[in-house]
Amino acid sequence: NFPLLRLVVLFSLCSGAVLALAEGNLRQSELALFGLLLNNLAKGDIVIGDSGFGSYVVVALLRGLGVDFLGRTTRSTDGRRRTKRLGKDDWLMTWKKPARPSRWLALAQWAGLPAELTVRVVRGQVTCKGFRVRQVTVVTTLLDPALYPAKEVLQAYLRRWRLEMCLDDLKTTLKMDMLRNRSPELVRQELS
């Protein structure tokens, strides 16, 4: 019976450095922990996240801070619902605000979110040496295809994935993939 810890980490994609982290138990969602990290972001930043963070609420909160998002999503990105085609496998679509508020978000924050968001959907193949070619679909608030070509958007997402693999390697090398302490205080000490 091992204690379990949930961590959400904000990394710099340029350096790989940990900028901030939020910790919690398994009853706390990753989205709620991510909400604790929002004050570490600045206008002009770009958050690259996995599908758990590609939600209307996260993207709307980030846009409210002047922060852009790039990542996968669990929402439908059906090309038939696109509002404007930007190129092959590249289009804009509108996300409507969900009918129900997110459980982890305060009602005042929910009320302040816009009724809809425009996001860009880019679909394509990404390759990483040693791995099979993958077809991915990402959403982003980087809407201008001239400034952010589709191929570069996909490559940026791939860099996030490589950083995640490096984190897994680091945990194994430092023998931190399985923490030995049982109390939260000792686990924090072991991590630092």
Segments and roles (model prediction):
Residues F2-S192:
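Single, function-defining residue in the core of a domain
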